Structures are given as structure tokens and as C-alpha cells.
């Protein structure tokens, strides 16, 4: 089954546009786990178990594991998600971007070591830095397009004078991803919820690509505006929330609180799509 098939299936089965981001910070763990990087797996597995029927995807951020030498815990978590929520796709948030030979190694890491269904990538180095991931037929790749951080304007909103129509950089990325780069229907785009007008612009340029949309929750993105701007019958959206769900409570009932926060976010997204 391809990533896009898994995504559509989980969206329908769980009636959800919500992606639960897994960005574990031991210093923010609840009492009993707080400060213990050896318990990253335990914390994340509890979140997964509490939200698996509410999510259309999970998105572990690799840096939050690697910073604590917890790659083996991430491998274990990936196995756990496969065993307990096999219908929910996993997007490895790695934002890799390097020359082809190095990209091939990163693709092995994402799809063979961790068994992810999709990965996030930086397209800054061009198509040959993306192509090795597309050799894994059925896997997905989300390209950074218009990101939610304020500094995204530094490059993404600059005009390309040498390209026909002088598009903004993020517009050019969207066109390339919808068109010549998307040879096997594996690409999607990352567009921040903090810029709903630009979500709408990206959707106009890439009408069928899945959009991974971070920034709802702690970053302040509006759920209803996000869905209205990005969702189309043939263009799915995957709306990520991480901290607002993970750290909904600092006590031993953190998993139940995470479930409550995830359900509230899912319901808000569903209300926006009607």
C-alpha cells in the first residue's frame, strides 16, 4: 500500500485530518518521567496509544531523538506504531537535503532503518537531492515550501527574476512539485498554518498534492482557516499539532490529557470541513 493510500485510509477510518507530532523534550515530561531521556520511548508510546484512533498520521521529529542519543528508542517506537496502529502512516520529520549520494544514505535511514512511510525534505539543492527518496516506490516525500517560522520570508518570499512570471520561491517549489518532479505521485508540500493566504496560493498551484501543515496549536495557526485554505476533494491536508497535545498536562494523567487535546483539535478541523 502506498503512503497516499494509507493517508486516505486513515483519514476516512479515523475521520481525521490531524497529524500528531512526536517532539519529545524530557525536561517537559510529566512527573515520574521528567528529565529522563531514557524514557522517551515510554512517553511517546503512551501518546501514540492514547491518540491512534484520532490521527490520520504520526510525525516523529528525528532531532528530538538524536539529541538524546535515542535513535534506538525511535526504532522501537516505529515498531510499536506498526504493531498497534498499522493503518496510521508515519511521517519521519527529518528535513534532509544533500547531494545525491548522501541523500541515498538518508533515504536508507528513513525507509529501511526506521521504516517510515514518508519523510520531510528540503528542496534547496534541487531535484537530484530528492530523487533517491523517490526510488522507494510507494513512499512519500514532503518538500518544504512555505514554512511556519518567521524567518521563512528571508528566502521563500523572494522573487525569481530568471523564471517565467518571476514567481516567489515557494510558488516555484509548488509548481515543480505538482509538475515535473512528481513522476510517480509521491510528493507533498509543507506549508505553515500561520500563513493561510499562502496555503490557498500553494493549493492553487498544486491542486492534488497532500499538504503537511504544521503550526496549529502552540504556534497559533487557526484550524478553521487552515482547512478552508488547503482542503480540496482531490487535495488532502495533514494538519500537525505537537506541543499542544504532548504537553497538555504535566501530571501522571498526561496521556488522557493528550487524548482530550487531540480530540478537540480533530473536532475543530472536522467542523471546518463541514
UniProtKB/Swiss-Prot annotation:
Q: Which PANTHER family match?
A: OROTIDINE 5'-PHOSPHATE DECARBOXYLASE
Q: In which pathway does it act?
A: Pyrimidine metabolism; UMP biosynthesis via de novo pathway; UMP from orotate: step 2/2
- EC number assigned by the record: 4.1.1.23
Catalytic activities: orotidine 5'-phosphate + H(+) = UMP + CO2
Source gene? pyrF
Q: What Gene Ontology molecular-function terms does this entry list?
A: orotidine-5'-phosphate decarboxylase activity
Q: What is this protein called?
A: Orotidine 5'-phosphate decarboxylase
- Name the protein family: Belongs to the OMP decarboxylase family. Type 2 subfamily.
